[in-house]
């Protein structure tokens, strides 16, 4: 097969496409496209244009209507004539094989959807054998129903270079062209092998968790890029990789933390996101087991994000999907130093909205009813960290007494309190 040489220095340009529907208004669509742009940037692409269209629902054949597709095609043509090549078009929903095939036939350009973009980022971020295996399985699950389309367009688009390699063009990292040459039966066999590997990893991880001793397990959960790893570094007093990009953390990091006299285990897990591919959730079972088996969840929220309440809902839904709903939880609102609001003019008589509330006013809304289950901090600026440690200490101590009432390894001050 012909070899493809991909320039490392060249940044691929991308066009984003989203829909405004009855259940997704223009503001929400723009917010979703902002997130999609951040995903594209994390994958190494540069977003140069956005298109939106109002429809009752996505068009079953081409996602957008014929007129909008023609508008996108005209834009790409004009850019090419001006010697500004467009590398790809990314759609903000998962596309069917038929939709991808029809859109590619019309636009004659690489087409990605939100799912394939997220999978690509996971392939780029995967470092350990465990993470690479989980990502590869998820990619094959996504690829299988689209295999015919991938065969058709493989030679024109070029191949990837293996999950975790971080090389190759956006959307094509991971299994790569050698795997795409396989027939359906061979891919199914490969998936079966990957599942066996993950089952063995699950056993090993389960054994490791059982051997950690009589310690309460606390897991950091939350939307992606809310500051979990930064908080992990502060609490554990050890460096944990943190970066202002989505999915900076894929593999679970577990550290032993001691607050005052009380030791416990703290884990930093992969962040959640809207429309998280089901195949990823299924494939990352061994990673998410840290959340499922935790005694206490610290749900970290970026309060400076305009849609933080929806992000809370996304995380809670994902927790329910993986069987971790109903666990003891502390809601930790992070990044209070970055919180902003829109101050209304004195002559503005329109009703105040959430965007007009100061942080102090926001704290007096539904959050005030949560009492000690709700905290406000800045991990970056180390604001209210002592309050957080105090609350975590009390909750971990309560859980420890309940779970290990006869444990005698704790220090004298703790024994006196009991």
Spans of features found by a protein language model:
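Short alpha-helix plus adjacent loop in nuclease-associated cores
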Residues: 117-138
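Switch I (effector-binding) loop of TRAFAC-class P-loop GTPase G-domains
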Residues: 210-213, 234-264, 273-283, 308, ...
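Switch II of P-loop NTPase G domains
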Residues: 2-5, 31-34, 57-74, 251, ...
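N-terminal accessory targeting/assembly segments
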Residues: 1-119
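C-terminal-of-GTPase-core extension/linker across diverse P-loop GTPases
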Residues: 1-16, 37, 148-226, 232, ...
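Conserved Switch II/interswitch segment of TRAFAC-class P-loop GTPases
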Residues: 23, 55, 59, 94-97, ...
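Conserved catalytic network of the ASCE P-loop NTPase/AAA+ motor domain
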Residues: 8-9, 77-84, 256-260, 265, ...
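Switch/connector loops and helix/strand junctions flanking conserved nucleotide-binding motifs
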Residues: 24-27, 58-62, 97-102, 119-122, ...
